[in-house]
């Protein structure tokens, strides 16, 4: 059985990948779509990291994360999501971590971009 892991906004919004970090980390190429947005569109919003966190969880496993109890996720008629605790459920949510955890997660994300420098 494989759990479905969700990263709610509360978790991903706590990790911001700043534009200057992105530009530096992808310095190995001039043609990176996110880098181009930051360099040409006067965009300084940074990126929140909820999507990469689920990938890290899939690759690295659960040990780096605090996860909710098991449950069942449902989609409501109004488009909102519900979560019902269930010992037999196949869904779990990542829980927000502290500042040290957020820094560690950002470093993992940044290292993926930096690794590509050595492979080009």
Describe each region flagged by the PLM:
Residues 1-120:
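N-terminal acidic, glycine/proline-rich low-complexity segments
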């Amino acid at each position: 059985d494989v759990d479905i892991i969700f990263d709610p906004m509360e978790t991903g919004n706590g990790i911001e990948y700043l534009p200057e970090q992105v530009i530096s980390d992808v310095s190995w190429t001039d043609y990176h779509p996110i880098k181009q947005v930051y360099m040409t569109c006067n965009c300084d919003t940074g990126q929140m990291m909820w999507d990469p966190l689920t990938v890290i969880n899939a690759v690295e496993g659960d040990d780096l994360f605090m996860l909710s109890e098991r449950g069942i996720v449902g989609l409501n008629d109004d488009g909102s999501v519900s979560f019902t605790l269930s010992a037999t459920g196949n869904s779990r949510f990542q829980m927000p971590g502290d500042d040290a955890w957020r820094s560690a997660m950002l470093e993992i994300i940044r290292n993926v971009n930096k690794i590509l420098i050595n492979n080009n």
